[in-house]
C-alpha cells in the first residue's frame, strides 16, 4: 500500500512539474496560435499554426494565461518595428475603462507612436508619404457559393525596405478611406494584409503597447482545415510548402 501511495504522489509531482514548465515556456518564451480567418491573407492562411515569441517586446499581463494582472505596464520592453506581424489583445471599452482587452488578433504594424496614418482610395499613407505598392499578380479565391473572386496582389514596400504582400479587391470599400490619425504615445496602428477583409485599427483604433502578446515568427504546421489530431486527412489537406516558413 505504501508503494502505491508513493507511486501516486510521484506521478502528481511529475504532472505538476510538467505543468509549471509548460506555463513558463508559454508565458516567457513561445506560444502556439491558430489562424481562423482570412484577414492576414496572403501572408497567413486559414489553417496555419504558428509560433509567437513572447520575449520579442518584453512582457505584460497578457503574456500570462488569463491575463493575470501581475503588473500594469510592460517590462523589459523592446519596441516593435513597422512591418512586424504581431498578436495582441484587441482593445474594447477603453472609454468606460471597465475592460481594456478582448480576444487575440493578429495583424501587421504599419504605424509607430507619433506616426501620422491615413488611407486614400486603398493606398496607405505614413507621415504624409504614400507607401510604395506594386501589383505583382492576381489570385483567384473560390467562395463557398461557387463564385470566383479575383484578388489583386500588391507588394507593399515600407520606407526601411521591408516588404510584404497584400490582397486588394477594391479601392472604394468601407475602410479604404479614413482621415489622418496621429498614433498615440505607447500605441501602434495595425492593418490586416487582406485589406478589404480585416477588422484592424481602422475599426478598433490604435493598439496600446500593453496589449501586445508577441511577435509571429514561424509557421510550424498548416492544413486546409483539418486539425492536428486528424492525421488521416494530412495526405490530402497538409500544406507542405508552408511548414517551417518564416513570417515576414
Identify what each model region corresponds to.
Residues 2-9, 24, 28, 33, ...:
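Soluble "head" domains of membrane/secretory-pathway proteins
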